[in-house]
Design a protein with these regions (language model features):
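NTP-dependent nucleotidyl-transfer catalytic core
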Residues: 2-150
């Protein structure tokens, strides 16, 4: 795929060796913005299915917590979705992902729901590199047009 120009960057060149060995567990993430899969899911789900056939183990991470915060689009803000709507969407996505792709599914709400903001900032904030985040194109574009973080 790299020689075809389909790879923009590789976060870790060692990853290629790991992919060739098989047996790696990885996740793909999606926010529950709808109760059904759509074409936007297709490419990452298809690649995950192919990796599963090559001996890897995909896990679908559904963003029950991140879906409540917002969707990081570079040029517009998404209206907030109610907790009830997010829960309904998670049920639909989970059922489809298990049936069609056989994925294990986890929800980030399960391990974030009990963390308060002070604990989060104290325990995890130190791992966020502001320069790294500000260098990202999607963050820059949101700042340029004055869109909030969510």
């Amino acid at each position: 795929m790299e020689w075809r120009g389909l790879v923009q960057n590789i976060s870790s060149p060692e990853l290629i060796d790991k992919l060739n060995k098989g047996g790696m567990t990885f996740y793909i993430g999606t926010d529950p913005t709808a109760d059904s899969m759509h074409i936007g899911h297709y490419s990452s789900f298809l690649i995950s299915k192919r990796l599963a056939k090559a001996g890897h183990h995909p896990i679908l991470l559904v963003g029950g917590a991140t879906g409540l915060i917002g969707d990081p689009k570079p040029s517009s803000e998404r209206p907030l979705i109610s907790k009830e709507e997010v829960e309904k969407n998670i049920k639909g996505l989970t059922a489809q992902a298990k049936k069609i792709f056989g994925f294990d599914v986890v929800n980030n709400w399960d391990w974030t729901k009990d963390i308060n903001i002070c604990d989060f900032l104290r325990d995890y904030g130190k791992y966020f590199n502001i320069n790294y985040m500000l260098a990202k194109d999607h963050v820059k574009s949101r700042m340029d047009v004055g869109i909030t973080y969510a």
